[in-house]
Every structure is written in structure tokens, then in C-alpha cells.
Amino acid sequence: MNPREEYDRGYHHLTQMFQEELRTHFHDPDGTVFYKGLKRMIDTYRIDLRNLRFFQVNLPSKHIADLVMEECASLGIPLDTLYTSMSKMGYCGPPMVFICLDAILREEKLHDKDLILSFVSEVSKFMQAGYAMRYYEQV
């Protein structure tokens, strides 16, 4: 079926994988699709993680974020860089990327060349997205 027609009719919600199917397809022996997608982004764009200040994981619960953080540590991402606002405001889906970025810019003291990294896997369709943003102090 045409993807636009599938979307317009709402069929994309009917074909999502849930529970055990999701676990089977999300976790591979060599890492989760999240880990592999993030690694591909870091490698493709040669993202230097040395000044990583915040890593914003856009997933619906902290325990899922904690699971992928264990894998991410092998990429050189320190566990203490995880940034989340879920405990304060819950999870509202894709807009969390911008809500967290706004919170970082308003509430945190950033230093010259601090790196903010964000990544998400939309697990029911395995779409992935991310950004890397470097902060520069004004001169």
C-alpha cells in the first residue's frame, strides 16, 4: 500500500509490533537497534565525544534509557551525561527532544564547546533520528 494512504487511513497504528515481538526485533546479539543507530550516526558524522556534557535519550521510560546507556558507555558516552526531564514532566513523545533541549539551555550552565547529543529510536517502526549540538560562548 502507498505509505501516504496507509498513514491517512491510520493503518500504521495497526501494524505496530508490541511486547515480545518488539523485544525480539529491538535486541540483536550485537546490540540494540538504538545502539547501532547511534554508533552509525557518531561514526558517519565523526562526532567527537570528548566534550560531551549532556546525552538526551528520547525514550518513554527511565529504565529503558538506563538499559541503552549501558551499551552507550562502550561508545565513550559516560553514564553521568544522561539528561532527562521525565521525573519532572513525564514523557510526551517526540516533542521531548525540544522540551529537554529548552530545559538544558534555560537551566544548565553550559561551557564553551560543550556538546549536547540526542538520539531516539521510534521502536514500533524502527525510525531513528538524532542531533549533535555544540555550545559556543559569545565573544
How does the language model describe each region?
Residues M1-S85, E137-V139:
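Hydrophobic pocket-lining "lid/loop/helix" segments that shape and contact the acyl-thioester
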Residues M1, F98-V139:
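Conserved beta-strand-centric core segments of catalytic alpha/beta enzyme folds
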Residues V33, G37, M96, C100-A103:
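Well-ordered alpha-helical segments embedded in enzymatic catalytic cores
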Residues F26-P29, K88-Y91, I104-R106:
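N-terminal start-of-chain detector that recognizes signal peptides
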Residues L82-M96, F119:
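Cysteine-centered functional microenvironments
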Residues N58-H63, G90, P94, E122-F126:
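Gly/Ser/Thr-rich loops at beta-strand to alpha-helix junctions
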